[in-house]
């Protein structure tokens, strides 16, 4: 997400920007950039709260202190169980019929005539209603999502159902391979702005939405804070190590 000092985000009047981050899994070993981004934005003065579709990838006792602290303050969408979730969804629909109807229309529009896709869309709708209610209770007024897959589908339905502005960080490559299955054009066009992790990612976004204006598109690369690393002592016969993924 852009640095708030030069972000395309804007709110009417003097309303304070309070951001919800919707992530697929938080914390997670392979998603350390989520943690660094959230902490970095908070250090810059942005009020950021996190919701995660799934629970952490490790037990709490196995989490580093900073990740355990984040987990304690993260809203986990699937944490209630089926029965309690069903009751909560019925309450949301009863108390906010307009929200439920807008969300249902958005979900069914995405599913088209594919029965399986519609079924998945209804699951995404359920999660979107829960996320929107959490945002309302926390007085959060902007939703940001990482990854362009199912979690972004939940984010888009949340925005449409609850009338909340939203944005997305796209990584690729999956969503670029099957744009229709990921509803990529709809996500790009409905988002307030789109963040790309590389110039190549940006070029793919512009292929999908060539009329997207520059003010709604930013490149923010994922990197490593070299200041946090200690160089190893030099060896006369160093070993070479090939890594598949850096986390």
Task: Name each model-derived stretch.
Residues 1-83, 136-138, 164, 189-193, ...:
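N-terminal subdomain of nucleotide-sugar transferases
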Residues 19-20, 141-175, 195:
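Active-site proximal beta-strand in glycosyltransferases
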Residues 30, 151-154, 202:
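Short, well-ordered alpha-helical microsegments
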Residues 237-247:
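Conserved donor-binding/catalytic core segment of Leloir-type glycosyltransferases
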């Amino acid at each position: 997400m852009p640095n708030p000092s030069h972000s395309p985000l804007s709110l009417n009047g003097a309303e304070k920007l309070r951001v919800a981050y919707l992530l697929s899994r938080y914390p997670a070993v392979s998603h350390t950039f989520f943690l660094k981004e959230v902490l970095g934005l908070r250090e810059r003065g942005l009020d950021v709260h996190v919701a995660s579709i799934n629970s952490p990838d490790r037990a709490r006792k196995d989490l580093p202190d900073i990740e355990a602290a984040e987990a304690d303050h993260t809203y986990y969408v699937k944490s209630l169980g089926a029965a309690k979730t069903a009751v909560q969804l019925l309450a949301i629909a009863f108390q906010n019929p307009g929200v439920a109807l807008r969300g249902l229309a958005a979900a069914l529009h995405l599913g088209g005539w594919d029965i399986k896709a519609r079924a998945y869309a209804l699951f995404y709708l359920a999660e979107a209603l829960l996320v929107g209610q959490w945002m309302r209770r926390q007085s959060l007024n902007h939703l940001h999502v990482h990854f362009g897959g199912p979690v972004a589908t939940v984010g888009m339905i949340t925005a449409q159902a609850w009338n909340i502005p939203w944005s997305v960080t796209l990584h690729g490559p999956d969503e670029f391979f099957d744009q229709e299955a990921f509803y990529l054009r709809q996500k790009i066009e409905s988002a307030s702005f789109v963040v790309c992790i590389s110039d190549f990612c940006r070029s793919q976004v512009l292929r999908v939405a060539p009329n997207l204006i520059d003010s709604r598109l930013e490149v923010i690369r994922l990197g490593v804070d070299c200041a946090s690393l200690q160089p190893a002592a030099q060896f006369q016969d160093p070993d070479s190590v090939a890594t598949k993924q850096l986390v």
